[in-house]
Amino acid sequence: MENKKVIVGISGGVDSSVSALLLKQQGYDVTGVFMKNWEEDDTDEFCSAEQDIADAQAVCDSIGIPFKKINFTAEYWDNVFEHFLIEYKAGRTPNPDILCNKEIKFKAFLSYVHLLGGDYIATGHYAQTRLAADGSVQLVKGLDDNKDQTYFLYTLGQEQLRQTIFPIGNIEKSKVREIAKENNLVTFDKKDSTGICFIGERKFKEFLSKYLPAQKGEIHDENGIKIGMHDGLMYYTIGQRQGLGIGGVKDRPEVPWFAAKKDLENNVLIAVQGHDHPLLFKQSLQAIELSWVAGMAPADKFRCAAKVRYRQKDQSCEVEVNQDGSVNVTFDQPQRAITPGQSVVFYIDDVCLGGGVII
C-alpha cells in the first residue's frame, strides 16, 4: 500500500470527499481530480458547477492532498451526449449515467490516471470488488442496499476493475455523512445531486428542446381513440403519469392515465388508465450491447435475478444468450414499464454479472 498512487475522482459531493479521506487515512498517495464534463450554458448551472469545484478544492486542502482539474467536455459530447440525443430521437429513453461511467470515468479518466502515474482510480460509488476463486474480479453490490450503484457500473470489465477502488462501498450512507462531519469536510451536509449529470436540476423538456426538434402528435387510448395531444414522443417515457395533459376524458372514469407505448411510425403516444393496466406489463424483453463483467456470459442459458431500472428489487428470471450476443430475458413475474433504451442488469446474489440495453 505504501506509495501506491491513487487518483480519486472528486465531484464536490460527500461520497467522493469521504472516499479521498479514507484512502489518505489508509496510507495511499492520493490526488484528487475534478472532472469537468459539460460546458455550462446557463447562469444557475454555472454557479452550481463553480460551487462543486470550490467544494472539491476545499476538501482536498482539508485532507492535505493535491487537487487537479481535467476537462473532458469534448469526450463527453462525442461519446455520451451525441449518443443520448440519437437515442431520444429514435424514441428510446437512454441512461447517460451508465454511458458516462463507461466512456468518461472508467475510460478517459483512467487513461489520464495512467498519465499521472497512478496505480489505481477511485470513485465515490456504492459498489465493491471481490476476488473470485478463479482469480477474476467480481463487481459486488454496495453494502447500503438502498444506495447500491452497480446498476450504473455493469459495463466495467476485468481490466478496469483491477485498477479500481470503491472506498465507501462497504459503508452505509448515513455513516459516510458522519465521517465527513467528524473530519470537518465542507461537503458533510451537501445534498446528493439528482438528475442527469449535464442537465442538473433543470427542466428536462426545456433542455431537450434546445437540441432536438419536437414533433407534436396525438395521444390515443388502447383502442385507437384520440384522447389528447402530445408535445413530442421523446418527452415521454413508458409508465409515465405526470405531464400527459389528459384530464376529464368524456365518458371515462376519473382514473389516472399512463404512457404505455410509442407508435413511432405514426407519431402516436398510446396511453392507458390505471397504474396496473395490463398493457403496462411485460414478462419478457430482448437486450443488445451486452457487457459481461467476467468477459463472457455465465452460460448460454441461466437463471439469475435482474433489474430493469435503478433501485428496483431483484426480479427472478431466465436469460438465454443468442448467437449474435443479444439476450432474451423471461421473468417469473410480469414487469411494469419495461423501457427501451434503459438497461437490464443481471445478478446472482450480490454479484453483478453484467447487463445490456433493452430494445
From Swiss-Prot:
Gene Ontology CC annotations of this record: cytoplasm
Spans annotated as Interaction with target base in tRNA: 95-97
GO biological process: tRNA wobble position uridine thiolation
Keyword RNA-binding recorded: yes
Active site: C100 (nucleophile), C197 (cysteine persulfide intermediate)
Region (Interaction with tRNA): 147-149, 309-310
Superkingdom of source: Bacteria
One of the record's GO molecular function terms: ATP binding
Catalytic reaction(s) noted: S-sulfanyl-L-cysteinyl-[protein] + uridine(34) in tRNA + AH2 + ATP = 2-thiouridine(34) in tRNA + L-cysteinyl-[protein] + A + AMP + diphosphate + H(+)
EC main group: transferase
Keywords: ATP-binding, Cytoplasm, Disulfide bond, Nucleotide-binding, RNA-binding, Transferase, tRNA processing, tRNA-binding
Subcellular location(s) of the protein: Cytoplasm
EC number(s) stated in the UniProt entry for this protein: 2.8.1.13
Cystine residue pairs: C100-C197
Binding site for ATP: G9, I10, S11, G12, G13, V14, D15, S16, M35, G124
Hydrolase in keyword set: no
Pfam families noted in UniProt: tRNA_Me_trans, tRNA_Me_trans_C, tRNA_Me_trans_M
Positions marked as site (Interaction with tRNA): H125, Q342
Family: Belongs to the MnmA/TRMU family.
Function: Catalyzes the 2-thiolation of uridine at the wobble position (U34) of tRNA, leading to the formation of s(2)U34.
Protein's name according to its UniProt entry: tRNA-specific 2-thiouridylase MnmA
The organism of origin for this protein: Francisella tularensis subsp. holarctica (strain LVS)
